[in-house]
Amino acid sequence: MKNIEEYFNSFYRGAKSPELKTMRYFMKKYNNFDKTMKFIHIAGTNGKGSCTEIISNILIKQGYKVGKFISPHLIKYNERISINKRNISDEEILELINELQPLVEEYKKGEKENVTFFEFITILALIYFYRNKVDFVILETGLGGLYDCT
C-alpha cells in the first residue's frame, strides 16, 4: 500500500441503498463485539463537534477511557479517531487496514456491493476502540437517520 490517504481515497464515495447490511456483515465477522460497548451517539444539525468534545472532556476528567469518532478531519484522517485525546497513529491505522482489506474484498465479491469510505473508517474506529478497551465511545452521526452506519 502506498499510503493511508491513497487507500482511503480509493473507497467508493457515492450513494448506496439506505440499509445497514455492510455494518452488520463486518460486526458479525467480529462476533458482534459492538453489542458489548457503551455508545454516546451525537446527532443534530449544529454543534455535534462541540457537544462531542464537551462530553469527552467530562468523561476523561472522571477517569474514563473515551474513544471519540468525528468527521470531517482538518489535516489527517487520524484526527477522526482518538482515545483520551490521542489520535490513532499511522501505524495503528495501517495495521487495521491490512487486517480489514481481505474482508472488504470478500464483501465486495459476495455482496456485489462496494464498501463506502465512511463505512470503512467507522468499522476501523470501532475495532480500534474495542481492542483498546474504552469505557465509552462517542460517535458523531455521519449522514443521520435510521440507516446511518454510526
Regions found by a protein language model. Give the residues of each.
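A conserved segment at the C-terminal end of the G1
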Residues: 38-42, 50-67
